[in-house]
Amino acid sequence: MLCSIYKSSKKEGTYLYIPKKDDFSQVPDTLMQMFGKPIPVMTIKLDGRKLAQVDIEKVKASLQNDGFFLQVPPPPENLLEKYKEQKAQQKNEQ
């Protein structure tokens, strides 16, 4: 299965996977408006491959069922909460 990957011109770290190059017909208009102008990244063969950020089986299923897959960046880590947790652990260890 081939797949073309595009990055968003509006949302950093957001990628759109589609089964046919430059065919955005299955992608909802509202999503395309939020995504901005798609910037081509690459076309890859998904079979027998691993992807760094997403589960390849989810990508394949979404491409077959929905006609696209949207990869969004993970939420930013809350450093303040992490610091508070570490301080609480240090207090408990004393």
From Swiss-Prot:
Q: Please list the residue ranges annotated as the YcgL domain.
A: 1-84
Q: Which Pfam families match?
A: YcgL
What is the protein's name according to its record?
Answer: YcgL domain-containing protein VP0875
Q: What is the lineage of its organism?
A: Bacteria, Pseudomonadati, Pseudomonadota, Gammaproteobacteria, Vibrionales
